[in-house]
Design a protein with these regions (language model features):
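Short C-terminal tail/terminal secondary-structure segment
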Residues: 1, 86, 97-110
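Active-site "substrate specificity/gating" loop of NAD(P)-dependent dehydrogenases
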Residues: 1-6, 11, 28-29
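Active-site helix of classical SDR
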Residues: 12, 20
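Short, flexible catalytic-loop segment of classical short-chain dehydrogenase/reductase
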Residues: 17, 39-53
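Alpha-helical segment proximal to the catalytic Tyr-Lys
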Residues: 25-29, 94
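Conserved SDR Rossmann-fold cofactor-binding beta-strand/turn motif
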Residues: 33-39, 43, 89, 102-104
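A short C-terminal helix-loop "cap" of Rossmann-like NAD(P)-dependent dehydrogenase/epimerase domains
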Residues: 52-70
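A conserved structural motif in NAD(P)-dependent oxidoreductases
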Residues: 58, 70-81, 92
Length: 110
């Protein structure tokens, strides 16, 4: 999903998805699954830093208007991203490869 002023960041996220799919094919037969996780707006120091940079150094976390664009109506938590990563690292995900997991409260689906 694109946003103003972050074209390079957005392009790099899409590049990771393409790399994931290619690497999954290249690792065929090795037993090494390749997947990626694509987090959305996560309550984190990174998000706080971005918000401050966009708003002159004194901005709080995302405002209500930003959160309204997320169907879950809240920011994600790092633990929610970690849960997907833990699943992908487990034996239960042994048949999963070449996939991109979006953890964004439905933002890119809306």
């Amino acid at each position: 999903m694109g946003s103003p002023h972050i074209a390079v960041y957005s392009a790099s996220k899409h590049a990771v998805i393409g790399l994931t799919k290619s690497a999954a094919w290249e690792c065929t037969g090795t037993g090494v699954p390749v997947n990626c996780v694509c987090p959305g707006l996560i309550d984190s120091r990174m998000l706080s830093t971005i918000m401050q940079a966009r708003n002159g150094g004194n901005a709080p976390m995302p405002n209500e208007k930003m959160v309204e664009r997320i169907p879950a109506r809240r920011l994600g938590q790092a633990s929610e991203v970690a849960s997907i990563v833990a699943f992908l690292a487990s034996d239960e995900a042994s048949y999963v490869s070449g996939s991109a997991y979006t953890v964004d409260g439905g933002r890119t689906a809306a």
